[in-house]
Amino acid sequence: MKTLKKQGGFTLVEIAIVLVIVGLLLAGVLKGQELIENSKIKNIAKDMDAVSASILSYRDRYRSLPADETGSTIVLYGWAANVGGGNNNGLIGAASVDPFGVVAGENVNAFRALRYAGFIGGNPADAAAAARPAHAAGGNMALGNTLWGLSGNVVCLNNLTGKFAGALDRLIDDGVNNTGIVRSATVAPAAAAAPAAGAYLEATTGYFLCKQL
């Protein structure tokens, strides 16, 4: 007479315990991702503030905005002459021009001047697009003026998701994309007028954001 063998397997209680553990692990991963994203957003905001503070400190020391000086003035500091060439008008670059589309002149040389002066890190020899500092979301920072309804000089970011752009706007300003000191859109900042009103679509990529200095 054959003896029936007891088949091994998981009980419902064991399966339930495993599912609970998996759920807790997933929740931990998601929470970790959220913390990382929040950290990046805060770091980007701090970097924008740091650029603003650096420009003010530069102006206090040199009585001019970075790269707004003439080349003959720049060489008196012992820096490369091509870091200068500005027009001393108190503005960085040409008005209402996409700062990410400019690879020469005050827009990019301002960062080189800040590096020569020791206000920000990086190699002052880096020129053109390479002069723009990177930000924590994988894009770059740029400087311009009179953009998106913001008068005077502005610092801008590219390559943001709607989630990051919206979070930055709410952290720094009013959370509305076309009002306040922060403006944002999925088109490059290349106009004096404010961008069209629109919601921050969190899953959408390619946002630009500018903050008045």
Question: What is the predicted role of each segment?
Answer:
Residues 1-10:
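N-terminal leader/signal peptides at the extreme start of proteins
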Residues 7, 21, 61:
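Short glycine/serine/threonine-biased micro-segments
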Residues 12-13, 33:
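Alpha-helical membrane-interface segments at transmembrane helix boundaries
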Residues 15, 19, 42-45, 108:
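Conserved structured core elements
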Residues 16-30:
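Alpha-helical hydrophobic helix detector
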Residues 29-50:
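Aliphatic-rich helix starts adjacent to a transmembrane/signal segment
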Residues 49, 53-73, 120-121:
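Alpha-helix exit/C-cap motif
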Residues 68-213:
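Low-complexity, acidic interaction segments enriched in glycine
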